[in-house]
């Protein structure tokens, strides 16, 4: 059963990543529209602002994914420690 769970988590993670990628792309299009109206598209500052905005968006995405994975790891650790305590208590009660 754990194989199916791993596959579902993997597919779910890929779906969330694609959704986040689409959100970043949408933000980039809005930002590019704003920059093209205010700055010249071939100016140095346009390129700098665009690069910084892209880095910030990907940084936020990376931090969000890291936070989600850490929360999942903590939940799995808590579940494992609870099951170990239950196993120890059942062994002690059987002795």
Swiss-Prot record:
It is found in: Virion membrane; Host cytoplasm. InterPro entries: Poxvirus_A9 (IPR006920). Glycans are attached at residues 79, 87. Residues 67-83 are virion surface. GO terms for cellular component: host cell cytoplasm; membrane; viral envelope; virion membrane. Residues 76-95 are annotated as: Disordered. This is Virion membrane protein OPG135. Induction: Expressed in the late phase of the viral replicative cycle. Residues 77-95 have a biased composition (Low complexity). Keywords: Glycoprotein, Host cytoplasm, Late protein, Membrane, Signal, Transmembrane, Transmembrane helix, Viral envelope protein, Virion. Residues 1-22 form the signal peptide. The chain crosses the membrane at residues 46-66. It is a single-pass membrane protein.
């Amino acid at each position: 059963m754990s194989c199916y769970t791993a596959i579902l988590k993997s597919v779910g993670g890929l779906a969330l990543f694609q959704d986040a990628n689409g959100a970043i792309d949408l933000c980039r299009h809005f930002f590019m529209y704003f920059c093209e109206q205010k700055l010249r598209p071939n100016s140095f500052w346009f390129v700098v602002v665009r690069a910084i905005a892209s880095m910030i968006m990907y940084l936020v995405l990376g931090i969000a994914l890291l936070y989600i994975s850490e929360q999942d790891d903590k939940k799995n650790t808590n579940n494992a420690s609870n099951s170990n305590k239950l196993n120890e208590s059942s062994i002690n009660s059987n002795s």
